[in-house]
Amino acid sequence: MKVIFQQDVKGKGKKGEVKNVSEGYARNYLIPNGLAVEATSANMKNLNAKKKSEEKKKEEELQEAKAYQTELEALTLELKAKSGEGGRLFGAISTKQIAEALSREGKKVDKRKILLNDPIRSLGYTNVPIKIHPEVTATVKVHVVEE
């Protein structure tokens, strides 16, 4: 019997997949528990419509992320920090401080999305990558100046 999985079922199939399973398994377990529905033509049309709307939604999210990327890349953040000789900072500029500076500019970014390997420990310009979307990464210029 062909069924369309409504949820992931370990070892059998993932959500949205169409598979052949034994009739007893489908009628006695999958369908009553809401894990799958019978693959009728109406259900197949619904599945295709859902897939199309999901693809469209993903495409819109990608376009929004690319637009946000250009906005972020146009920015140059200026952060002030106390420094000693040779431009070395007392302390460091962390992702939290960069996220706060971005929010002051009106750009909301989660600090966990800022891909800074090590905190910034010197004066000057640093390019900081920010992951906006799984496929889109923006690079923001951070200018650290002496306080």
Swiss-Prot record:
SUPFAM superfamilies: L9 N-domain-like, Ribosomal protein L9 C-domain. GO terms for biological process: translation. One of its GO terms (molecular function) is structural constituent of ribosome. Keywords: Ribonucleoprotein, Ribosomal protein, RNA-binding, rRNA-binding. It comes from the Bacteria. Signal peptide: none annotated. One of its GO terms (cellular component) is ribosome. Belongs to the bacterial ribosomal protein bL9 family. Binds to the 23S rRNA. PANTHER family: 50S RIBOSOMAL PROTEIN L9. This is Large ribosomal subunit protein bL9. It comes from Halalkalibacterium halodurans (strain ATCC BAA-125 / DSM 18197 / FERM 7344 / JCM 9153 / C-125) (Bacillus halodurans). The gene is rplI.
